[in-house]
Amino acid sequence: MRTTYMAKPNEVERKWYVVDAEGQTLGRLASEVASILRGKHKPTYTPHVDTGDHVIIINAEKIHLTGNKLQDKIYYRHSGHPGGLKETRAADMRANKPEKMLELAIKGMLPKNTLGRKQGMKLHVYAGSEHKHQAQKPEVYELRG
């Protein structure tokens, strides 16, 4: 009888991928990138082991939001002090911190535990078309759809 393959942390082969966010829809891009970060695109995927790859996202400032989300979507954060609730519209977020907008969308799709935090550290987002990871020889990842 065969047993199910379980990846071991020291056996995991990690690749680096570059994803161009220009013209891509925020949620559709985020769900594919989250899947790569978790390692679900590999046949060696194991739920309790970090089998994911590194993902570099460029052109985050050119991400697309459907409908009226650019004006209507609001990001909330709290300082921890009474009356410290802050809100930012999606249009302002895309203009000032486009990297943060993508990071929030992708990290929201990862597990809320230590493994998810570790997987989130393999995400590298840049507003422009330049990134500083040429030494890792990243491959261009073509998104489905």
From Swiss-Prot:
PANTHER family: LARGE RIBOSOMAL SUBUNIT PROTEIN UL13M, RIBOSOMAL PROTEIN L13
Stretches assigned to coiled coil: none
Keyword Ribosomal protein belongs to the record: yes
GO biological process assignments: negative regulation of translation; translation
Assembly information from the UniProt record: Part of the 50S ribosomal subunit.
Record InterPro entries: Ribosomal_uL13, Ribosomal_uL13_bac-type, Ribosomal_uL13_CS, Ribosomal_uL13_sf
Biological function: This protein is one of the early assembly proteins of the 50S ribosomal subunit, although it is not seen to bind rRNA by itself. It is important during the early stages of 50S assembly.
Keywords in alphabetical order: Ribonucleoprotein, Ribosomal protein
Record carries keyword Ribonucleoprotein: yes
Native species: Halalkalibacterium halodurans (strain ATCC BAA-125 / DSM 18197 / FERM 7344 / JCM 9153 / C-125) (Bacillus halodurans)
Protein family per UniProt: Belongs to the universal ribosomal protein uL13 family.
Protein name listed in UniProt: Large ribosomal subunit protein uL13
Superkingdom in the source lineage: Bacteria
GO cellular component terms, A-Z: cytosolic large ribosomal subunit
Molecular function GO terms recorded: mRNA binding; structural constituent of ribosome
Pfam assignment, any one: Ribosomal_L13
